[in-house]
Amino acid sequence: MFYSLSVKNFILIDELEIEFSKGLCVITGETGAGKSILLDAILFCLGYKTSNNIIKHGKDYTVVNIIFSLNEKIKKFLIQNFIEPEELLLVKCLQKAEGRKSFFINNQIVTKTLIKQLANYLFELHGQNNNITLLEASTQRDILDSYGDLLEFRVKLAKCYQIWQNTRKEIEEITVKQNVIEQEIDYLNFVTEELTKLNIQIGEEETLTNIRQDLQNKNKDLQLIRDIIAQINNPEINISINRAEKLLARQRDNDRFKAIATSLEEAYNNLEVARQELSNLLDSFTYEEYNLEETEERLFLIKAISRKYNVPANELGIFLDKSLEKLVILKNKIANSHKLQAQEVLLQEQYYKLANDLSARRLIAAKHLEESLNQELKQLKMEKANFKIEIKTAIDPTASGNDDIVFKASTNPGMKAEEINKIASGGELSRFMLALKTSLFDKMIKPSIIFDEIDVGIGGEAADKVGDRLKKLSSVTQVIVITHQPQVAGKADLHIKIEKTQLEQETKIKVKALNLAERQRELARMISGKTITDASLKVAKELLYPVACPHDQK
């Protein structure tokens, strides 16, 4: 609820501070006294659109502070927006002549958007030009569902709707991308088959590179052996040695040639040994595990695949694993599409079953609310008015159900019921809202409700009934009323008077909380005008009797 309001340099106000109370708070004053300025100050502080010229003439800034009491919803909102709750809630708006507005919550600077979101938790405003929320379809739906205790059921429906819509969205995404997904599956099938077949191991490229180098070195040795064998296997060598031996055999008795013959024989034997060793060495190369041609082919293939997929050879195995994982996911998407379609049908059936149930409950609640509100309108002296709730099947289902809900009314007999905003004046709309609030009573109630001149165009018994309903409503929430009716003001728990004083150089506004005697004179003024008579004082005293002597009331 509103705890206090302080204003400085705002339009005609130099500086003022008002403390509010629980229950019914009324604000009165002569026409043109500036009652609406207080309302403008509240709206200014809470981020609503106000007139441009709000800074008092001759001043370079204006500031408005409002202190509110807290409830659990407000505390939760503050915590969700990283603002530490304190014992009371301080909201401030500062505007300098040359700059934009600055908003604060508990002295922490915040955005205008956040302030307006917070305001939804703090109060409602109903008046000549401020019944916009009543005209919104969402508000009318919420009013009906609150009256019929259907909000929890609606939460259940909303959850079902959300799951249904998420499933539909997933199906649509798969359908739109199905061709792309199928192409990607074909590509990944090819990739995984190719890489699986190649079976490239981690470190294989490095191993094969080393083997190739080794084989290249061995091939050089092999070629050398073959060249040597080719030389020593030359038939001319054996022929030459045989001829030399035959020539030496003729000189076997000559001691000078014996040593040469022996050396020549040893040379022949050594040559045979060399041939054998070279042959054995050659045979050992024949059974190597790798050959250079195969190794180079494998290396070429690995490098080509690495370039093809732009993946380092050492990471081709990881690339294969990831491709296999992605392939499984995409195949599951296609497979799940059919499951999702079946699931979507079931969810749709479940949604419409719940929505139809909600519609049936709304029809029952609408009938009872119509009866209750029409009875309240009679109490507010709008006997000729007739309130109706029209419920039609919506074109598109929503999280709130499958109904279009429209509040309609006729204000005179024989008139066709039209949408409530088309047939009701600002004051009538306010009384419609008062009737709704009284019918709902302890439901959909915010900490504070402000009614701006709800009693315009009525008087006498009708004004008294409006006052009774406001008083009843104030038992469950703080009600602040700007009024011209003494019957309404007489029922207040707190009476605030606004006076405007015209000086030579400027106009000033004074705000005061009245005591009982002051209230009597103010009510008398409201009854008889500027000239207060004994008769008006007597009537004022009678209006205040329930306040002055509460224990005498039954």
From Swiss-Prot:
GO cellular component terms, semicolon-separated: bacterial nucleoid
Domain of life per record: Bacteria
Keywords on record: ATP-binding, DNA damage, DNA repair, Nucleotide-binding
Family annotation (InterPro entries): DNA_recomb/repair_RecN, P-loop_NTPase, RecF/RecN/SMC_N
Pfam families xref list: SMC_N
Keyword Magnesium recorded: no
CDD domains (alphabetical): ABC_RecN (cd03241)
GO biological process terms, semicolon-separated: DNA recombination; DNA repair; SOS response
Signal peptide range: none
GO MF assignments: ATP binding
Entry binding sites for ATP: 29-36
Keyword Nucleotide-binding among UniProt keywords: yes
Described function: May be involved in recombinational repair of damaged DNA.
Family: Belongs to the RecN family.
PANTHER family reported in the protein's UniProt record: DNA REPAIR PROTEIN RECN
Name the UniProt record assigns to this protein: DNA repair protein RecN
Source organism of this protein record: Rickettsia prowazekii (strain Madrid E)
Lineage: Bacteria, Pseudomonadati, Pseudomonadota, Alphaproteobacteria, Rickettsiales
